[in-house]
Protein backbone atom coordinates (compact mmCIF):
# COMPACT_ATOMS: atom_id res chain seq x y z
CA UNK A 1 0.00 0.00 0.00
CA UNK A 2 2.83 2.40 0.87
CA UNK A 3 4.61 1.64 -2.41
CA UNK A 4 1.34 2.19 -4.28
CA UNK A 5 0.86 5.63 -2.70
CA UNK A 6 4.43 6.71 -3.51
CA UNK A 7 4.22 5.49 -7.11
CA UNK A 8 0.86 7.11 -7.83
CA UNK A 9 2.00 10.36 -6.18
CA UNK A 10 5.16 10.76 -8.25
CA UNK A 11 3.33 9.79 -11.46
CA UNK A 12 0.66 12.36 -10.64
CA UNK A 13 3.28 15.07 -10.10
CA UNK A 14 4.89 14.22 -13.42
CA UNK A 15 1.59 14.40 -15.28
CA UNK A 16 0.86 17.71 -13.57
CA UNK A 17 4.05 19.15 -15.07
CA UNK A 18 3.00 17.82 -18.47
CA UNK A 19 -0.29 19.68 -18.00
CA UNK A 20 1.50 22.91 -17.14
CA UNK A 21 3.60 22.64 -20.29
CA UNK A 22 0.60 21.91 -22.47
CA UNK A 23 -1.77 24.60 -21.21
CA UNK A 24 0.51 27.34 -19.92
CA UNK A 25 0.64 28.87 -23.37
CA UNK A 26 -3.18 28.99 -23.69
CA UNK A 27 -3.60 31.39 -20.76
CA UNK A 28 -0.73 33.58 -21.95
CA UNK A 29 -1.81 33.51 -25.59
CA UNK A 30 -3.49 36.95 -25.63
CA UNK A 31 -0.22 38.45 -24.34
CA UNK A 32 1.97 36.36 -26.66
CA UNK A 33 -0.24 37.14 -29.67
CA UNK A 34 0.15 40.86 -29.12
CA UNK A 35 3.93 40.57 -28.79
CA UNK A 36 4.43 38.23 -31.78
CA UNK A 37 1.54 39.59 -33.93
CA UNK A 38 -0.42 36.31 -34.11
CA UNK A 39 -4.08 35.67 -34.97
CA UNK A 40 -6.83 33.15 -34.09
CA UNK A 41 -5.69 30.75 -36.81
CA UNK A 42 -2.23 30.73 -35.28
CA UNK A 43 -3.68 29.52 -31.96
CA UNK A 44 -4.90 26.42 -33.76
CA UNK A 45 -1.56 25.93 -35.50
CA UNK A 46 0.50 26.18 -32.29
CA UNK A 47 -1.87 24.02 -30.26
CA UNK A 48 -2.25 21.52 -33.08
CA UNK A 49 1.50 21.18 -33.59
CA UNK A 50 1.99 20.07 -29.99
CA UNK A 51 -0.94 17.64 -30.26
CA UNK A 52 0.41 16.04 -33.45
CA UNK A 53 3.84 15.53 -31.86
CA UNK A 54 2.08 14.16 -28.75
CA UNK A 55 0.24 11.66 -30.98
CA UNK A 56 3.39 10.39 -32.69
CA UNK A 57 5.26 10.05 -29.39
CA UNK A 58 2.38 8.27 -27.65
CA UNK A 59 2.16 5.74 -30.48
CA UNK A 60 5.85 4.84 -30.55
CA UNK A 61 6.89 5.40 -26.95
CA UNK A 62 3.87 3.63 -25.50
CA UNK A 63 4.92 0.50 -27.34
CA UNK A 64 8.57 1.07 -26.36
CA UNK A 65 7.63 1.23 -22.68
CA UNK A 66 5.94 -2.18 -23.02
CA UNK A 67 9.31 -3.51 -24.19
CA UNK A 68 11.90 -1.61 -22.14
CA UNK A 69 9.93 -0.86 -18.99
CA UNK A 70 8.16 2.29 -17.84
CA UNK A 71 10.93 3.97 -15.86
CA UNK A 72 13.32 4.67 -18.73
CA UNK A 73 10.64 6.28 -20.88
CA UNK A 74 9.21 8.32 -17.99
CA UNK A 75 12.55 9.71 -16.83
CA UNK A 76 13.71 10.46 -20.37
CA UNK A 77 10.52 12.39 -21.11
CA UNK A 78 10.82 14.41 -17.89
CA UNK A 79 14.44 15.31 -18.62
CA UNK A 80 13.56 16.60 -22.10
CA UNK A 81 10.68 18.56 -20.57
CA UNK A 82 12.90 20.14 -17.91
CA UNK A 83 15.74 21.07 -20.25
CA UNK A 84 13.59 22.53 -23.03
CA UNK A 85 10.48 24.10 -21.43
CA UNK A 86 12.22 27.47 -21.23
CA UNK A 87 12.83 27.41 -25.00
CA UNK A 88 9.22 28.43 -25.64
CA UNK A 89 10.11 31.84 -24.27
CA UNK A 90 12.90 32.25 -26.83
CA UNK A 91 10.59 32.13 -29.87
CA UNK A 92 10.69 35.20 -32.11
CA UNK A 93 7.65 34.35 -34.23
CA UNK A 94 5.09 31.72 -35.22
CA UNK A 95 7.51 29.18 -36.75
CA UNK A 96 9.89 29.33 -33.81
CA UNK A 97 7.04 28.73 -31.38
CA UNK A 98 5.68 25.86 -33.49
CA UNK A 99 9.08 24.13 -33.61
CA UNK A 100 9.55 24.36 -29.86
CA UNK A 101 6.03 23.06 -29.21
CA UNK A 102 6.68 20.10 -31.53
CA UNK A 103 9.65 19.02 -29.41
CA UNK A 104 7.76 19.57 -26.16
CA UNK A 105 4.79 17.65 -27.53
CA UNK A 106 7.05 14.68 -28.18
CA UNK A 107 8.25 14.67 -24.56
CA UNK A 108 4.73 15.08 -23.18
CA UNK A 109 3.34 12.37 -25.45
CA UNK A 110 6.07 9.93 -24.47
CA UNK A 111 5.26 10.38 -20.77
CA UNK A 112 1.49 9.85 -21.10
CA UNK A 113 0.90 6.15 -21.99
CA UNK A 114 3.85 4.97 -19.89
CA UNK A 115 2.54 6.86 -16.85
CA UNK A 116 -0.97 5.44 -17.26
CA UNK A 117 0.31 1.86 -17.47
CA UNK A 118 2.69 2.40 -14.55
CA UNK A 119 -0.21 3.68 -12.44
CA UNK A 120 -2.35 0.65 -13.27
CA UNK A 121 0.54 -1.72 -12.52
CA UNK A 122 1.09 -0.04 -9.15
CA UNK A 123 -2.60 -0.19 -8.17
CA UNK A 124 -4.64 -2.87 -6.44
CA UNK A 125 -7.51 -4.14 -8.60
CA UNK A 126 -10.21 -2.44 -6.56
CA UNK A 127 -8.40 0.93 -6.70
CA UNK A 128 -7.58 1.13 -10.41
CA UNK A 129 -10.25 3.67 -11.31
CA UNK A 130 -9.56 5.82 -8.26
CA UNK A 131 -5.78 5.83 -8.73
CA UNK A 132 -5.99 6.56 -12.45
CA UNK A 133 -8.31 9.43 -11.54
CA UNK A 134 -5.77 10.81 -9.06
CA UNK A 135 -2.92 10.51 -11.55
CA UNK A 136 -4.84 11.96 -14.50
CA UNK A 137 -6.51 14.83 -12.64
CA UNK A 138 -3.21 16.65 -12.18
CA UNK A 139 -2.90 17.36 -15.92
CA UNK A 140 -5.74 19.85 -15.83
CA UNK A 141 -5.53 20.73 -12.11
CA UNK A 142 -1.99 22.02 -12.62
CA UNK A 143 -2.27 23.06 -16.26
CA UNK A 144 -5.69 24.73 -16.24
CA UNK A 145 -6.34 25.24 -12.52
CA UNK A 146 -3.04 26.34 -11.01
CA UNK A 147 -1.31 27.71 -14.13
CA UNK A 148 -3.86 30.44 -15.07
CA UNK A 149 -3.76 31.85 -11.54
CA UNK A 150 0.04 31.62 -11.39
CA UNK A 151 0.38 33.30 -14.79
CA UNK A 152 -1.90 36.16 -13.78
CA UNK A 153 0.32 36.76 -10.74
CA UNK A 154 3.70 36.23 -12.45
CA UNK A 155 2.98 38.55 -15.37
CA UNK A 156 2.87 41.45 -12.91
CA UNK A 157 6.56 40.87 -12.16
CA UNK A 158 8.22 39.10 -15.12
CA UNK A 159 7.92 38.96 -18.90
CA UNK A 160 5.91 36.10 -20.43
CA UNK A 161 9.13 34.72 -21.94
CA UNK A 162 10.56 34.05 -18.47
CA UNK A 163 7.43 32.35 -17.11
CA UNK A 164 8.19 29.09 -18.95
CA UNK A 165 11.58 28.69 -17.25
CA UNK A 166 10.04 28.73 -13.76
CA UNK A 167 9.00 25.08 -14.17
CA UNK A 168 12.37 23.61 -15.26
CA UNK A 169 13.67 22.83 -11.74
CA UNK A 170 10.47 21.05 -10.58
CA UNK A 171 10.78 18.85 -13.68
CA UNK A 172 14.31 17.76 -12.75
CA UNK A 173 13.24 16.98 -9.18
CA UNK A 174 10.32 14.83 -10.35
CA UNK A 175 12.60 13.03 -12.84
CA UNK A 176 14.93 12.08 -9.96
CA UNK A 177 12.01 10.91 -7.80
CA UNK A 178 10.64 8.85 -10.68
CA UNK A 179 13.97 7.06 -11.11
CA UNK A 180 14.08 6.32 -7.37
CA UNK A 181 10.47 5.18 -6.91
CA UNK A 182 9.19 3.58 -10.14
CA UNK A 183 10.59 0.05 -10.61
CA UNK A 184 12.09 -1.11 -13.91
CA UNK A 185 9.67 -3.76 -15.14
CA UNK A 186 10.56 -6.10 -17.97
CA UNK A 187 8.18 -8.25 -19.99
CA UNK A 188 8.86 -11.67 -21.39
CA UNK A 189 11.35 -11.88 -24.26
CA UNK A 190 8.76 -12.93 -26.81
CA UNK A 191 6.95 -9.63 -26.31
CA UNK A 192 10.11 -7.58 -26.73
CA UNK A 193 10.98 -9.42 -29.94
CA UNK A 194 7.67 -8.67 -31.67
CA UNK A 195 7.53 -5.70 -34.01
CA UNK A 196 5.67 -2.51 -33.12
CA UNK A 197 3.43 -3.03 -36.14
CA UNK A 198 2.44 -6.47 -34.88
CA UNK A 199 1.58 -4.99 -31.49
CA UNK A 200 -0.51 -2.19 -33.03
CA UNK A 201 -2.35 -4.71 -35.18
CA UNK A 202 -2.95 -6.87 -32.12
CA UNK A 203 -4.53 -4.10 -30.03
CA UNK A 204 -6.70 -2.91 -32.93
CA UNK A 205 -8.17 -6.40 -33.22
CA UNK A 206 -10.17 -5.61 -30.04
CA UNK A 207 -13.47 -3.87 -30.85
CA UNK A 208 -13.32 -1.71 -27.71
CA UNK A 209 -9.97 -0.25 -28.78
CA UNK A 210 -11.37 0.71 -32.18
CA UNK A 211 -14.31 2.48 -30.53
CA UNK A 212 -12.08 4.12 -27.92
CA UNK A 213 -9.82 5.66 -30.58
CA UNK A 214 -12.76 7.58 -32.05
CA UNK A 215 -14.15 8.47 -28.61
CA UNK A 216 -10.77 9.93 -27.64
CA UNK A 217 -10.98 12.18 -30.70
CA UNK A 218 -14.36 13.46 -29.47
CA UNK A 219 -13.25 14.13 -25.89
CA UNK A 220 -9.99 15.82 -26.90
CA UNK A 221 -11.74 18.07 -29.40
CA UNK A 222 -13.79 19.39 -26.49
CA UNK A 223 -10.82 19.75 -24.13
CA UNK A 224 -8.32 21.30 -26.52
CA UNK A 225 -10.76 23.59 -28.34
CA UNK A 226 -12.16 25.07 -25.14
CA UNK A 227 -8.80 25.42 -23.39
CA UNK A 228 -7.18 27.04 -26.45
CA UNK A 229 -9.95 29.42 -27.51
CA UNK A 230 -11.96 30.26 -24.38
CA UNK A 231 -9.43 32.94 -23.28
CA UNK A 232 -9.90 34.77 -26.58
CA UNK A 233 -13.68 34.25 -26.45
CA UNK A 234 -13.82 35.80 -22.98
CA UNK A 235 -11.56 38.74 -23.81
CA UNK A 236 -12.61 39.54 -27.38
CA UNK A 237 -16.30 38.56 -27.44
CA UNK A 238 -17.44 38.93 -23.82
CA UNK A 239 -14.96 41.77 -23.11
CA UNK A 240 -13.85 40.50 -19.69
CA UNK A 241 -10.64 41.83 -18.18
CA UNK A 242 -7.55 39.59 -17.92
CA UNK A 243 -8.09 38.85 -14.23
CA UNK A 244 -11.71 37.74 -14.76
CA UNK A 245 -10.66 35.64 -17.75
CA UNK A 246 -7.99 33.89 -15.66
CA UNK A 247 -10.54 33.18 -12.93
CA UNK A 248 -12.97 31.63 -15.41
CA UNK A 249 -10.17 29.63 -17.05
CA UNK A 250 -9.17 28.16 -13.69
CA UNK A 251 -12.59 26.46 -13.60
CA UNK A 252 -11.41 24.10 -16.36
CA UNK A 253 -8.64 22.72 -14.18
CA UNK A 254 -10.72 22.61 -11.02
CA UNK A 255 -13.70 20.97 -12.73
CA UNK A 256 -11.52 18.49 -14.57
CA UNK A 257 -9.69 17.55 -11.37
CA UNK A 258 -12.94 16.98 -9.48
CA UNK A 259 -14.50 14.93 -12.28
CA UNK A 260 -11.35 12.91 -12.91
CA UNK A 261 -11.18 11.99 -9.24
CA UNK A 262 -14.87 11.25 -8.62
CA UNK A 263 -16.23 9.61 -11.76
CA UNK A 264 -13.53 6.96 -12.39
CA UNK A 265 -13.87 6.04 -8.70
CA UNK A 266 -17.63 5.69 -9.29
CA UNK A 267 -16.90 3.44 -12.29
CA UNK A 268 -15.11 1.01 -9.93
CA UNK A 269 -18.52 0.49 -8.34
CA UNK A 270 -21.16 0.81 -11.06
CA UNK A 271 -19.16 -0.01 -14.20
CA UNK A 272 -17.25 1.92 -16.85
CA UNK A 273 -19.92 2.14 -19.57
CA UNK A 274 -22.73 3.71 -17.47
CA UNK A 275 -20.37 6.42 -16.24
CA UNK A 276 -19.17 7.12 -19.80
CA UNK A 277 -22.71 7.58 -21.10
CA UNK A 278 -23.79 9.73 -18.13
CA UNK A 279 -20.70 11.93 -18.48
CA UNK A 280 -21.19 12.42 -22.23
CA UNK A 281 -24.75 13.65 -21.74
CA UNK A 282 -23.63 15.93 -18.90
CA UNK A 283 -20.76 17.49 -20.86
CA UNK A 284 -22.95 18.13 -23.90
CA UNK A 285 -25.68 19.84 -21.88
CA UNK A 286 -23.16 22.01 -20.05
CA UNK A 287 -21.59 23.14 -23.34
CA UNK A 288 -25.00 24.31 -24.54
CA UNK A 289 -25.47 26.28 -21.30
CA UNK A 290 -21.95 27.72 -21.58
CA UNK A 291 -22.72 29.01 -25.06
CA UNK A 292 -25.65 31.04 -23.70
CA UNK A 293 -23.98 32.26 -20.48
CA UNK A 294 -23.05 35.68 -21.86
CA UNK A 295 -20.56 37.77 -19.85
CA UNK A 296 -21.82 36.49 -16.48
CA UNK A 297 -18.57 35.47 -14.76
CA UNK A 298 -20.09 33.19 -12.05
CA UNK A 299 -22.25 31.41 -14.66
CA UNK A 300 -19.31 31.08 -17.05
CA UNK A 301 -17.21 29.63 -14.22
CA UNK A 302 -19.87 27.10 -13.17
CA UNK A 303 -20.78 25.88 -16.65
CA UNK A 304 -17.15 25.59 -17.77
CA UNK A 305 -16.38 23.77 -14.50
CA UNK A 306 -19.10 21.20 -15.24
CA UNK A 307 -18.14 20.76 -18.91
CA UNK A 308 -14.70 19.61 -17.83
CA UNK A 309 -15.96 17.78 -14.75
CA UNK A 310 -17.60 15.38 -17.18
CA UNK A 311 -15.26 15.60 -20.17
CA UNK A 312 -12.03 14.93 -18.33
CA UNK A 313 -13.56 11.92 -16.63
CA UNK A 314 -14.31 10.62 -20.12
CA UNK A 315 -10.68 11.08 -21.17
CA UNK A 316 -9.44 9.34 -18.03
CA UNK A 317 -11.75 6.35 -18.39
CA UNK A 318 -10.91 6.04 -22.08
CA UNK A 319 -7.10 5.98 -21.82
CA UNK A 320 -7.07 4.31 -18.41
CA UNK A 321 -9.36 1.50 -17.21
CA UNK A 322 -11.30 0.96 -20.45
CA UNK A 323 -8.12 0.73 -22.50
CA UNK A 324 -6.09 -1.35 -20.05
CA UNK A 325 -8.92 -3.78 -19.32
CA UNK A 326 -9.64 -4.42 -23.02
CA UNK A 327 -6.22 -5.93 -23.87
CA UNK A 328 -3.63 -8.28 -22.31
CA UNK A 329 -1.43 -6.70 -19.64
CA UNK A 330 1.63 -6.89 -21.91
CA UNK A 331 -0.03 -4.50 -24.37
CA UNK A 332 -1.47 -1.92 -21.97
CA UNK A 333 0.80 0.98 -22.90
CA UNK A 334 0.66 0.06 -26.59
CA UNK A 335 -3.15 0.18 -26.53
CA UNK A 336 -3.15 3.43 -24.59
CA UNK A 337 -0.61 4.87 -27.04
CA UNK A 338 -2.74 3.97 -30.06
CA UNK A 339 -5.88 5.51 -28.53
CA UNK A 340 -4.01 8.65 -27.46
CA UNK A 341 -2.30 8.95 -30.86
CA UNK A 342 -5.53 8.92 -32.85
CA UNK A 343 -7.25 11.23 -30.38
CA UNK A 344 -4.38 13.72 -30.30
CA UNK A 345 -3.77 13.65 -34.05
CA UNK A 346 -7.36 14.35 -35.04
CA UNK A 347 -9.00 15.75 -31.89
CA UNK A 348 -6.05 17.66 -30.49
CA UNK A 349 -4.35 18.45 -33.80
CA UNK A 350 -6.52 18.76 -36.89
CA UNK A 351 -9.77 19.57 -35.08
CA UNK A 352 -8.26 22.52 -33.24
CA UNK A 353 -6.76 23.80 -36.50
CA UNK A 354 -10.25 23.63 -38.01
CA UNK A 355 -11.56 25.45 -34.94
CA UNK A 356 -9.01 28.19 -35.54
CA UNK A 357 -10.32 28.67 -39.07
CA UNK A 358 -13.92 28.66 -37.77
CA UNK A 359 -13.00 31.46 -35.35
CA UNK A 360 -11.25 33.41 -38.11
CA UNK A 361 -14.01 33.08 -40.72
CA UNK A 362 -17.22 32.89 -38.66
CA UNK A 363 -16.13 34.70 -35.52
CA UNK A 364 -14.87 33.57 -32.13
CA UNK A 365 -18.48 33.38 -30.84
CA UNK A 366 -19.04 30.20 -32.94
CA UNK A 367 -16.13 28.30 -31.45
CA UNK A 368 -18.25 25.99 -29.23
CA UNK A 369 -20.16 24.45 -32.16
CA UNK A 370 -17.36 21.98 -32.96
CA UNK A 371 -16.94 20.44 -29.47
CA UNK A 372 -20.72 20.20 -29.08
CA UNK A 373 -20.99 18.22 -32.32
CA UNK A 374 -18.18 15.83 -31.35
CA UNK A 375 -19.78 15.12 -27.97
CA UNK A 376 -23.03 14.16 -29.69
CA UNK A 377 -21.02 11.77 -31.88
CA UNK A 378 -19.32 10.43 -28.76
CA UNK A 379 -22.67 9.66 -27.12
CA UNK A 380 -23.75 7.62 -30.14
CA UNK A 381 -20.48 5.68 -30.26
CA UNK A 382 -20.38 5.00 -26.52
CA UNK A 383 -23.40 2.71 -26.89
CA UNK A 384 -21.08 0.28 -28.72
CA UNK A 385 -18.64 -0.08 -25.82
CA UNK A 386 -18.34 -3.39 -24.01
CA UNK A 387 -18.15 -3.25 -20.21
CA UNK A 388 -14.62 -3.98 -18.96
CA UNK A 389 -14.85 -3.69 -15.17
CA UNK A 390 -13.13 -6.88 -13.90
CA UNK A 391 -15.47 -9.69 -12.86
CA UNK A 392 -13.36 -10.23 -9.76
CA UNK A 393 -14.09 -6.65 -8.71
CA UNK A 394 -17.81 -7.12 -9.27
CA UNK A 395 -17.68 -10.18 -7.03
CA UNK A 396 -15.77 -8.35 -4.30
CA UNK A 397 -18.28 -5.51 -4.23
CA UNK A 398 -21.20 -7.92 -4.22
CA UNK A 399 -19.73 -9.57 -1.14
CA UNK A 400 -18.66 -12.70 -3.04
CA UNK A 401 -15.12 -14.04 -2.80
CA UNK A 402 -13.76 -14.82 -6.27
CA UNK A 403 -12.81 -18.40 -6.94
CA UNK A 404 -9.09 -19.02 -6.82
Predicted segment positions?
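Juxtamembrane intracellular "pre-TM" segments in multi-pass secondary transporters
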Residues: 1, 184-212
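Glycine-rich segments within core transmembrane alpha-helices of 12-TM secondary carriers
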Residues: 130-148, 340-351
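Helix-breaking motifs and short loop linkers at transmembrane-helix boundaries and internal kinks
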Residues: 37, 69, 90-96, 239, ...
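Cytoplasmic helix-loop-helix junction between adjacent transmembrane helices
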Residues: 100-139
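Helix-loop-helix hairpin linking two adjacent transmembrane segments in secondary transporters
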Residues: 135-180
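C-terminal transmembrane helical hairpin of 12-TM major facilitator-type secondary transporters
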Residues: 272-322
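Conserved MFS/SLC helix-loop-helix module at the cytosolic interface between two early adjacent transmembrane helices
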Residues: 56-92, 267-273
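Extracytoplasmic gate region of multi-pass secondary transporters
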Residues: 25-26, 208-257, 320
Amino acid sequence: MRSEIKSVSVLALGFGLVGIDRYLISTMYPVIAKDLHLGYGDIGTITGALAIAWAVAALWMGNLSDRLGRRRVLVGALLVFSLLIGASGLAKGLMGLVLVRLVMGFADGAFTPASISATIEASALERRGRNIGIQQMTLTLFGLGFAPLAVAALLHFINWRVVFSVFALPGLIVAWLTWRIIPARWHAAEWRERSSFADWKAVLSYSNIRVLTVLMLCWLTCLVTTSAFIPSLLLDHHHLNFSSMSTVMSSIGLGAAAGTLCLPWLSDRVGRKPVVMLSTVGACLMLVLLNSAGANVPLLFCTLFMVHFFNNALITLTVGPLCAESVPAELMATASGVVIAVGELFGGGFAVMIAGQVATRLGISKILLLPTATLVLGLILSTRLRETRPRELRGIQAGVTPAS
